[in-house]
Amino acid sequence: MSEAKFMRIIVFFDLPVITAAKRKAANQFRQFLLKDGYQMLQLSVYSRIVKGRDSLQKHHNRLCANLPQEGSIRCLEITEKQYAAMKLLLGELKTQEKKVNSDQLLLF
């Protein structure tokens, strides 16, 4: 039996914030992502590490269960190796990204 691979779920979203109710829905979605272990890469781009396909499916299902009514949300599932090969073209790594590499997990 093969060992489960570490993978990443990357969520990209564009949510309407014109009215107070829509801002509230967008904030609730962001709060869900943070509570479910996602880390913000950029504004409206969040990433979460998972181990194996079962965990990936579990978090994908949670994500789908917490979608707001409106907006555009995309999900990309990649291996940790693919994630580690991502190149930063402009700017600097966030403090957390410098401290946690693909061999480490963030524990709370």
UniProtKB/Swiss-Prot annotation:
Pfam families for this protein: CRISPR_Cas2
Keyword Metal-binding tagged: yes
GO function terms (MF aspect): metal ion binding; RNA endonuclease activity
UniProt KW 4Fe-4S keyword: no
Transmembrane portions of the chain: none
Cofactors, names only: Mg(2+)
InterPro entries reported in the protein's UniProt record: CRISPR_associated_Cas2, Virulence_VapD/CRISPR_Cas2
Binding site for Mg(2+): D14
Consequence of gene disruption: No effect on CRISPR interference during plasmid transformation.
Protein keywords: Antiviral defense, Endonuclease, Hydrolase, Magnesium, Metal-binding, Nuclease
Gene Ontology biological process terms in this record: defense response to virus; maintenance of CRISPR repeat elements
EC number, UniProt record: 3.1.-.-
Family: Belongs to the CRISPR-associated endoribonuclease Cas2 protein family.
Assembly notes: Homodimer, forms a heterotetramer with a Cas1 homodimer.
HAMAP family, sorted: Cas2
Function: CRISPR (clustered regularly interspaced short palindromic repeat), is an adaptive immune system that provides protection against mobile genetic elements (viruses, transposable elements and conjugative plasmids). CRISPR clusters contain sequences complementary to antecedent mobile elements and target invading nucleic acids. CRISPR clusters are transcribed and processed into CRISPR RNA (crRNA). Functions as a ssRNA-specific endoribonuclease. Involved in the integration of spacer DNA into the CRISPR cassette.
Descriptive protein name: CRISPR-associated endoribonuclease Cas2
